[in-house]
Amino acid sequence: MNEKTDIFSYKSTFDPRLNINLIFKENPNYNNMRDIFDVYGYGFVAPEFKSIFIDGEIFLGEDGFTLDDLKFIEAHEISHILLGHNGPRSEKDELEADLGAYILLKKYNISTERLEDEFEYRHGVPFSEELLTMVEDKM
């Protein structure tokens, strides 16, 4: 990727109607977006633009996130849409979005390792496929 790139966009793997946009610090809107990332995490959905915005800076450097991490973030954000989450951020919605992401990642044969490794830290309970019953009928 060219160092001067300020945004990298592609169609979602999970829903090609949505654009995935990785925003980098060279983008003139990055500082404003950074404030949103600080509130919502690595990414957020902008349904009015049919887009998901992800902080591209987390993928740079030796300790940067991987392609599997990117797909986890993408699947998580798309799960918010599929699950009808549209209110203020809640722990329940975040838990459900991670479970939805697990279902999507498995469906597309993409690693769920990061999701499973981080699940207890993120939600206070260990990951179990039994939890999927919370969202299976909505996905």
Residue ranges and their predicted role:
Residues 1-34:
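A metal-dependent hydrolase signature that marks the N-terminal structural subdomain at the beginning
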Residues 16, 29-33, 98, 112, ...:
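Short amphipathic alpha-helical segments that mediate assembly, nucleic-acid/protein binding
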Residues 23-25, 30-67, 78-84:
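Active-site scaffold of zinc-dependent metalloenzymes
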Residues 67-72, 93-96:
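Alpha-helical scaffolds flanking conserved acidic
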Residues 74-83, 96, 100:
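Active-site His/Glu-centered metal-binding helix of metallohydrolases
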Residues 83-86, 105-109:
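Hydrophobic/aromatic-lined pockets within catalytic cores
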Residues 90-107:
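An active-site-proximal "capping" alpha-helix that borders the catalytic cofactor pocket
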Residues 106-139:
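Long, well-structured alpha-helical subdomains associated
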